[in-house]
Amino acid sequence: MVIEPLEGARKIITNVEAKEEMLSILDTIRNSSDIKGILMLYTEKYHGNIEYKQYLLESLESNIHSDKGRYTTTFRSAVNQFLKIIRNLSIPIAAGINGDLGPNDFGLILAYDLRIATEKAYFYNPNLELGYPPSALLSFYLSRSLGPAKATEILMTKSKISSREAFDLGLITEIVSEQELEERCLEKLRELSTIPSHALIETRRILQPSLDEISKHLDTSLEGFLRCLYKRQN
């Protein structure tokens, strides 16, 4: 099944309706015996640092003018719900990227089984340029994937990464043409669908971090993020 998440993780994590809609779709897929794999197809363009900064500031406003820590709680809850479903899927899940991914989506796809991109794909990490710490999801999964030293180097020196650079780092499984992308992703999903479901689930549990570990990182990261936002407001 192909899903094209408009506005990606950012909307799913911060918008309750969008989150519930995505969780409902994934729940339906999970309960279907006819669907053999999930392709999350990313085709949107990055709208620039000004638009992204506005999103960060709106996040701060929602935290200030609502119950204390609401944004932090909402973010952590949405991430945990989404990752829990991914971990327990009995079918493979892959990302097909033919556009731009912001920091949260970049981090999130590292939890998928496969990531296939085109030469047009770019991954953005503008937080430090804007005066904020890295995305909680991106900093966590990048560190897990590459180790703390390499992750630190990338987060501090790279605000934009090409698909070729991501492939060389081992973050992308394969690079294909735009015309080949969807079919290649579906082909790889069909290959992985031959793995018994219980073995697939247990493999993820062995290789993926625990949700408690992720939650602790999210709390620490978001506290630092909010401190920076408050300081820039004052």
Say what each PLM segment does.
Residues M1-T43:
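Conserved CoA-thioester-binding segment of acyl-CoA-metabolizing enzymes
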Residues M1-V2, T157-S193, A199-E213, L222, ...:
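Amphipathic alpha-helical segments at domain termini/boundaries
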Residues E4, G8, L39, S215, ...:
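Intrinsically disordered, low-complexity segments enriched in small/flexible residues
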Residues D34, Y42-A78:
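Glycine- (often His-adjacent) and acidic-residue-rich active-site loop
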Residues M40, L108-L110, A166, C185:
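Hydrophobic/aromatic residues within transmembrane alpha-helices
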Residues A78-L130:
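Glycine-rich beta-to-alpha active-site loop
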Residues S139-A149:
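Hydrophobic, secondary-structure "cap" segments at the distal end of domains
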